[in-house]
Amino acid sequence: MEYSFSTREKNGGICLILSYKVNSKWKQKTKQGFKTLREAKQYQDKLLAAAKEDAACGADPELADITFKSFTQNIYLRDKGPSLEYSTKRNYFFMLRSIPALCDKPIREITAGDVINVYQDMGRFSEGTRKNRFAQIRAIFNYAIHPYKIITVNPADSVTQVKDKTPRRVKALTEKESLQLLDALSDTSIFYMIAFIALNTGMRYGEIAGLTWNSVNFTRQTITIDKQYNWISPEKRGFKAVKSRNGNRTIHMNTKLAARLNAWKQTVPISIDGRVIPTTPSTHALMNRQLRKLKQGISVHTLRHTFATMLLSKSKDINLVAAVLGDNVATVAATYIHYTDDIRKEADQYIETMYK
């Protein structure tokens, strides 16, 4: 490989410049911050080795010193952006904010030890948050390997992730607690309706916020869930696709819910966008705050769990519950494992009595 070194003064120090030729094209690599020419010359072998590595793997020299943060924001999210939901993009920025030790470090200089330290520091987060953010970090390093060829080994592969094997029971209300909660919310009409819908359908908050009147069929007593309402940009909320393919579903609307919705339709002006519940950007947070005043540790999502556990206990059918919730069977089985265990125990009793 044809190459030459030169130096120049920059910002009060010495900048080492390597010019080298790859496939008939001249490229440059630089390293600055040296106090003397001697220091700069001593670094020549390292800079040349880096240039040879670039030439061998085909990496763009302009990306050689790109930081983890810059690569994530300016390349990874730029390339992946069209296929990512706004909320997912926002989570990447939350992730970057939580790992300052990696953000401003060039990707090529990040070691397995650096990533291990970051992973250990993320122990302050919940298991789910830690797992998701580390998955994002790993994906970004993989993208730096292919297609950008900035590095050849993923430093995140050296991390042994901690798995919390402690069984966790989802928070769900009893039937009595559900009725008490509805009584307590009766003075706040929107909160009451959101809770009533969630407890009788298991719909997610975003699905309730995105429910429109043309998706409610009073004749057939069905609700069609084919969209949700959430942030679609930093400044705007709007309709968006449901969480997954399974999320598109039509479910039964029981007689009590049909009556409530019919009465609601007669008393509340229909919004321009046709939404049944005209939520605002603060509705979700305010309702969660109100729910926690009534019972510590619960949220709107607790009402979905409540519906699921009640339906599971009455129907004993995991496939049915998964279809109504818009989840897959594996997710339902894992989330409500304590309740599915009860079903298995009941099945054991039936098996014992067979053919007697």
Residue ranges and their predicted role:
Residues L181, E235-F239, T335-K356:
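DNA/chromatin major-groove-contacting recognition/catalytic segments
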Residues K10-C15, Y20-I116, I270:
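N-terminal DNA-binding module of tyrosine recombinases/phage integrases
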Residues H146, F196, N200, E207, ...:
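C-terminal catalytic core of tyrosine-transesterase DNA break-rejoin enzymes
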Residues K131, I150-V153, D157-Y205, A209-L211:
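Basic, Lys/Arg- and aromatic-enriched nucleic-acid-binding interface segment
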Residues Q228, N254-G297:
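Active-site/catalytic core of tyrosine-dependent DNA strand-transfer enzymes
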Residues L211-A263:
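Conserved tyrosine-mediated DNA breakage-rejoining catalytic core shared by Y-recombinases
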Residues R108, I150-V153, K163-D183, S233-T255, ...:
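DNA breakage-rejoining catalytic core of tyrosine-based enzymes
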Residues L77-Y143, P147-T152, P167, S189, ...:
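N-terminal core-binding DNA-recognition domain of tyrosine site-specific recombinases/integrases
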